[in-house]
Amino acid sequence: MVSSRPRRRKRASATQLYQTCKAAGTCPPDVVHKVEQTTVADQILKWGSMGVFFGGLGIGSGSGTGGRAGYVPLSTGSRAVPPKSLVPDVVARPPVVVDTVAPSDPSIVSLIEESSIIQSGAPSLTIPTEGGFSVTSSGTDVPAILDVSSTNTVHVTATTHHNPVFTDPSVVQPIPPVEAGGRLIVSHSTITTSAAEEIPLDTFVVHSDPLSSTPVPGTSGRPRLGLYSKALQQVEIVDPAFLSTPQRLITYDNPVFENVDDTLQFEQPSIHDAPDPAFMDIITLHRPALTSRRGVIRFSRVGQRGTMYTRRGTRIGGRVHFFRDISPIGAADDIELHPLVASAPHTLETPHTLETPLDTTDALFDVYADMDTIDDDAAYATFSLHPADSTRISNTSIPLATVSDTLLTSGPDIVFPSIPAGTPYLPVSPSIPAISVLIHGTDYYLHPAYYLRKRRKRILAHQYVAT
């Protein structure tokens, strides 16, 4: 089996080596002498050519061409070469005759031919026999006006309008410049004083003053940090020193004057063991950031690892997101409120059988009741409320006090109309008769205090209440 030999690469020539190594100054001496023609042979030719001249034989360091005539054999002579005519074969032009100037000839030579000289003199007048202008004369003193304008007349008119709102009437306006040709007719009116016209203007800026004493500038959206992308490794740190002195988790040195709120740079040796294995090969630790994620406050820093080195000294490594959860964000606590003034409980019965204790101490009083006639003995009153369309009717029972300790006052009575029952029963529309006071409506309701605080009824003899 024949083994394949490695292919031999072509070596660089001296010229190529000189071009690459001359700027750096690392060229070998033989390459420099060969390219710059400073070898021993070149020096001999340079100094010897000063005393010896070989003519056009072509002997030298150049290519051997034998000179201009080339190589000629010594035994034979050179062949004759017919001369070539530089001027092509054309018809010869006649020779120019040159006249000689004799000594007796004038020294002024005329350069203009006599045939081109025009004799000066008064030209003869030619009187036309036909044509001309017809002039009509009259005996009056009015001068004649002749229309000598052409038929193609262009009329240009310039009109200027002055607005008294923006023009001061006391200033005389000059005639506007007009750049045109032909006949120009420029007219302008006399400037007179006139009253200014009121033009309604729209207000674009409605309110330029701040709406508050301390206006709050508009806040722009916070940039997205992108801490949870696939390009970052997520590492949770348990050590609390990560919040205050993160450099202690990366190196054993003690940088006294470093600010932990800025980006930290670390120069690690090739073999280094970090105090915390999670911070191995960390060369850059960026500034901290506080974020909220999943109901907790998170302290985050992004670090850059320097795992590999290149020949140029560049460090290559991944990016890591170090975080630590500080505290959870809990829900708002329910604060139990207690009444400041104790009061008697009251029960409100609704159609849904829901009992609600009411405090009537701070409730609104009846507009028909007097502040001096309010009875505080009705401590435990139970009443029921039903909607207007319910068939159930209930009364409010209030224990009455004796006549001796009660001040009797007369107040307005509300008389509810009633429909007498008849036979047969006829349908009545509406089913509920109209009354002067409505306690149920579509857009309002009666406050519960009005149900509880009723006005005092007129008490007659034998403890009966007037209805």
UniProtKB/Swiss-Prot annotation:
Repeat in keyword set: no
Gene Ontology terms describing biological process: microtubule-dependent intracellular transport of viral material towards nucleus; symbiont entry into host cell; viral penetration into host nucleus
Intracellular or extracellular location(s): Virion; Host nucleus; Host early endosome; Host Golgi apparatus
One Pfam family named in its UniProt record: Late_protein_L2
Post-translation changes: Highly phosphorylated.
Disulphide bridges, residue numbers: C21-C27
GO terms for cellular component: host cell; host cell endosome; host cell Golgi apparatus; host cell nucleus; viral capsid
Function: Minor protein of the capsid that localizes along the inner surface of the virion, within the central cavities beneath the L1 pentamers. Plays a role in capsid stabilization through interaction with the major capsid protein L1. Once the virion enters the host cell, L2 escorts the genomic DNA into the nucleus by promoting escape from the endosomal compartments and traffic through the host Golgi network.
Protein's UniProt name: Minor capsid protein L2
InterPro entries noted in UniProt: Late_L2 (IPR000784)
UniProt keyword Cell inner membrane present: no
Family: Belongs to the papillomaviridae L2 protein family.
Subunit structure: Interacts with major capsid protein L1. Interacts with E2; this interaction inhibits E2 transcriptional activity but not the DNA replication function E2. Interacts with host GADD45GIP1. Interacts with host HSPA8; this interaction is required for L2 nuclear translocation. Interacts with host importins KPNB2 and KPNB3. Forms a complex with importin alpha2-beta1 heterodimers via interaction with the importin alpha2 adapter. Interacts with host DYNLT1; this interaction is essential for virus intracellular transport during entry.
One annotated GO molecular function: DNA binding
Lineage, uppermost ranks: Viruses, Monodnaviria, Shotokuvirae, Cossaviricota, Papovaviricetes
Entry keywords, A to Z: Capsid protein, Cytoplasmic inwards viral transport, Disulfide bond, DNA-binding, Host endosome, Host Golgi apparatus, Host nucleus, Host-virus interaction, Late protein, Microtubular inwards viral transport, Phosphoprotein, Viral penetration into host nucleus, Virion, Virus entry into host cell
Motif Nuclear localization signal location, chain numbering: 1-12, 452-462
Predominant location category: virion
Top-level lineage group: Viruses
